[in-house]
């Protein structure tokens, strides 16, 4: 399991969303990773071993008008531990970070990219409970083995070619080898292919929020000489430079993009897209990071991964029922929901049980309490028929 886009996730566990419900779900979701062995049923559930949750903490660079201004009140409202660090404390903890204000983001072929900063950042927002998961593909294998221990069966290397229906509700799926799988409930969790699966179910045009596949690159570069970022680094969200980065094995730094407006978005066919790292994007992301990380070079050899986000119209996921009874969706995850695997599964299970028992979720949106924090999550917030949320970052930040 997990050899789709999940295997190339940056697997960052953070709480810096733009909305109360987004932050609440992410904080609840973190507790699944912190309790991973118990959640799965014990340390021996997977012969390949269990993933590690590296709880390094996250620092978010605070620049004037930055994303932290939206995040801090949400952290406070949910009593999520956080600290404000001065520039001095930030550089004491991570001495290789520079303190200039570089935004708004530009590309290296723009003269504005090379202008020396004249302002200094405010400091950093630190959340000690966040971090990253060591191996996203292994984490899905962990879940596979735990599910199999509870009686689940997995089928691989087959394509769904039809969503079967009978009497106005779903009745199962047909696979490309002719296999018919009968099921009273079907859940679309097809990632970047989710809109195609919805089309198979005859649901095109029935939702107010749509999804489509976005090509994205993540790059790997060596840590600057003299600093071991793998052991001494942490997850850094730098909206001012339009990148985020975290430790990677082999004393490398993994660099992702925070989707600045100057970068052209590549909407693609999920079955046919360029899977090679592009020189222009390689230079843009690595050089942006090099502004913040002193001594970071631009290697000649490009290393990293190319994969897809399943992006909703407002970069907020859709966790909902559909107009086809028995057919549910957990889609539009927009590159920011890996961390929520556990809590999203809990919410979907509660939703499915309630709707199948007769609850009218569209008229009376279900509210679900987190199993760890007890926080109440309003599933109406993730409705397929919501209006586009103006509070969203409209980026991977959610």
Describe every region a protein language model picked out.
Residues 125-145, 191-193, 240, 277-288, ...:
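Mid-domain beta-loop-alpha active-site segment that forms a flexible
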Residues 10-110, 242-244:
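Dinucleotide-binding Rossmann-like beta1-alpha1 core, especially the glycine-rich loop
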Residues 35-39, 146-150, 196, 200, ...:
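Active-site catalytic microenvironments for nucleophilic, acid-base chemistry
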Residues 1, 11, 35, 41-57, ...:
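Active-site substrate-recognition segment that forms the wall
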Residues 96-99, 105-117, 298-343:
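FAD-binding beta-loop-beta segment adjacent to the flavin cofactor pocket
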Residues 84, 323-398:
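C-terminal lid/capping helical subdomain adjacent to the catalytic/cofactor pocket in oxidative enzymes
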Residues 63-150, 155-156, 162-169:
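Flavin (FAD/FMN) cofactor-binding and adjacent substrate-gating region
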């Amino acid at each position: 399991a997990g050899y789709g886009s999940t295997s190339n996730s940056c697997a960052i566990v953070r709480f810096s969303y733009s909305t109360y419900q987004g932050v609440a779900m992410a904080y609840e979701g973190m507790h699944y990773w912190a309790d991973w062995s118990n959640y799965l049923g014990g340390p021996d559930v997977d012969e390949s071993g269990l993933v590690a949750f590296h709880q390094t903490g996250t620092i978010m660079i605070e620049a004037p008008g930055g994303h932290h201004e939206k995040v801090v009140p949400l952290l406070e409202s949910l009593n999520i531990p956080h600290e404000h660090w001065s520039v001095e404390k930030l550089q004491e903890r991570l001495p290789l970070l520079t303190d200039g204000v570089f935004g708004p983001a530009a590309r290296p072929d723009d003269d504005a990219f090379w202008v020396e900063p004249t302002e200094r950042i405010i400091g950093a927002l630190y959340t000690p409970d966040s971090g990253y998961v060591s191996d996203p593909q292994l984490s899905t294998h962990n879940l596979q083995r735990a599910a199999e221990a509870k009686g689940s069966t997995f089928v691989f290397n087959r394509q769904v070619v039809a969503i079967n229906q009978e009497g106005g509700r779903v009745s199962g799926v047909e696979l490309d080898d002719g296999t018919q799988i009968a099921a009273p409930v079907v859940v679309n969790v097809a990632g970047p292919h989710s809109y195609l699966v919805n089309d198979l179910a005859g649901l095109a045009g029935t939702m107010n929020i749509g999804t489509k596949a976005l090509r994205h690159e993540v790059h790997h570069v060596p840590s600057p000489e003299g600093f071991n970022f793998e052991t001494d680094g942490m997850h850094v969200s730098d909206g001012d430079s339009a990148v985020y980065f975290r430790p990677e094995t082999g004393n490398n730094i993994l660099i992702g993009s925070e989707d600045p407006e100057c970068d052209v978005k590549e909407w693609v066919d999920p079955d046919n897209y360029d899977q090679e790292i592009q020189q222009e994007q390689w230079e843009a992301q690595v050089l942006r990071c090099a502004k913040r990380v002193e001594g970071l070079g631009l290697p000649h050899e490009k290393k990293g991964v190319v994969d897809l986000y399943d992006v909703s119209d407002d970069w907020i996921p859709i966790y909902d029922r559909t107009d086809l009874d028995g057919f549910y969706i957990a889609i539009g995850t927009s590159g920011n929901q890996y961390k929520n695997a556990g809590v999203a599964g809990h919410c979907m299970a509660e939703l499915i049980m309630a709707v199948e028992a007769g609850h009218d979720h569209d008229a009376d949106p279900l509210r679900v309490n987190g199993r760890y924090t007890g926080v109440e999550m309003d599933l109406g917030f993730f409705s397929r028929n919501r209006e586009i949320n103006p509070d969203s970052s409209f980026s991977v930040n959610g």
